[in-house]
Amino acid sequence: MVEKDTWKLITATALFTVAVTTITDYAWTSWQAQKQVIAQQKNKNKGGQTKSDTDKYHQYDEQFIRQSLKNNVEFLGEDTIEKLSNQYVVVVGAGGVGSWVVNSLVRSGCRKIRVVDFDQVSLSSLNRHSCAILNDVGTPKVECLRRHMREIAPWCEIDPINELWTLQNGERLTLGNGTPDFIVDCIDNIDTKVDLLEFAYNHGIKVISSMGASAKSDPTKLNVGDLATTEEDPLARVVRRKLKKRGILSGIPVVFSAEKPDPKKAKLLPLPDEEYERGKVDELSALKDFRVRILPVLGTMPSLFGLTITTWILSNISDKPLEPVEGKNRIKVYDGIYQSLAGQMSRVGIPSQRIPLALKDVSYLVEEVFKGKSPISGISTRLTLTKWDPSKPISLQNVVVLTKNEQKVHEDRVLKGKESLQDVYDAKVLKLVSQRFREEAYYSQFR
């Protein structure tokens, strides 16, 4: 009985100690914050802030800053947060994606960021910018970010560069304040984007690039992977092709969406007829070679791209690196599915027939057309391909994704047994398969 009471006393003492420590920590932090707010208010009352950002940084001691990053410290560890505080990141492009990168980097503990962008905050960009408000419209995007980030973490050094990044001034704009640990590409002009990626690659600087967020709306299709493995991203395809011409085949990590572009969702925004009638349409763009018409952007998507980029950076410098599936490029899986169709052809007595499908068509059929699951059972494991209608040749509109067991039944009853599709499958399955084939016929126009 005495031993039991002793353990109760020890437990109660431990809980009391934890509670007192937590309360003391909270009280100290609150007192520090209140003291600093009062000091700032007094400074304003004297006629505005006269101290430089460097001096202002010293108003906040390290323990106070660490408390503001408490959750990140607990998750990533003290060493990673310390390392992050010493990272120098250059973000090129301060729009929908870039502003979220800067915002989340600052909130995560990065203390030295250079932001390069020539553009101004527009009214139409407020739906996707990380911090811009109505009063910021018409002001440089980089200055907008600096002002708002100062309110969040005044100890962070934001270096705003209100210029267009070009290959000619790349050395100055990228390396002028020292060699960065990371370059983040959030540019939406293709040629400038390619130049920046080549610059980072040739200088051996870690880089991550945002691909196209326009006309995308499915967050479940967001991926991180090498540029060489992207799918269903027209911007990535063009950038990849241009970099190949410059001898860069891989080694550029990107954030991209594998969602198939669908004109039914979003189309290139038209230019008003009156602008065409005035002539010299190219002069309407902000700069030579920059876009005049644009694809519409769902406001939530750029933020996902930006936050993913920051998460990649955090993971890269920690002991918790990302292990992404390279988009949907599960080559071995798709090759196995492809071989399942070749094996079926041998089993039904036509081994010499060349399958008119490429390996890339397999990922397209599995992921895009049949949504990664069998139309019969809805199961998404042990998938194969099977010829559907025995009276028609194999094509993208006569191949169905089935499980291995379903493939065997289909072979025995339809392909070998000569039973009709209507006798083997109910109307619901037949309707769904027909719907998938119609969707493929539509999608194939844009492949």
Swiss-Prot record:
The UniProt keywords, alphabetically, are: ATP-binding, Ligase, Membrane, Mitochondrion, Mitochondrion outer membrane, Nucleotide-binding, Transmembrane, Transmembrane helix
As a miscellaneous remark, the entry gives: Present with 1170 molecules/cell in log phase SD medium. ct(6)A is involved in promoting decoding efficiency. It is an unstable modification that can be easily hydrolyzed and converted to t(6)A during nucleoside preparation by conventional methods.
Q: Which GO terms describe its molecular function?
A: ATP binding; tRNA threonylcarbamoyladenosine dehydratase; ubiquitin-like modifier activating enzyme activity
- Report any one BP term from Gene Ontology: cyclic threonylcarbamoyladenosine biosynthetic process
Task: Report which gene this protein is encoded by.
Answer: TCD2
The entry summarizes the disruption phenotype as follows: Displays only the t(6)A but not the ct(6)A modification in tRNAs. Unable to sustain respiratory growth under non-fermenting conditions.
Q: Look up the coiled coil feature and give its residue ranges.
A: none
Asked if Transferase is a keyword of the record, the answer is no
Q: What is its main location?
A: mitochondrion
Family, according to the entry, reads as follows: Belongs to the HesA/MoeB/ThiF family.
Entry GO CC: mitochondrial outer membrane; mitochondrion
- What is this entry's stated membrane topology? Multi-pass membrane protein
**E.C. no:** 6.1.-.-
Q: Where in the cell is it found?
A: Mitochondrion outer membrane
Q: Which CDD domains match?
A: YgdL_like
What is the protein name stated in its UniProt record? Answer: tRNA threonylcarbamoyladenosine dehydratase 2
> What residues form the membrane-spanning segments?
9-29, 86-106, 294-314
Source species: Saccharomyces cerevisiae (strain ATCC 204508 / S288c) (Baker's yeast)
Top-level taxonomic group = Eukaryota
What biological function has been recorded for the protein in this entry?
Catalyzes the ATP-dependent dehydration of threonylcarbamoyladenosine at position 37 (t(6)A37) to form cyclic t(6)A37 (ct(6)A37) in tRNAs that read codons beginning with adenine.
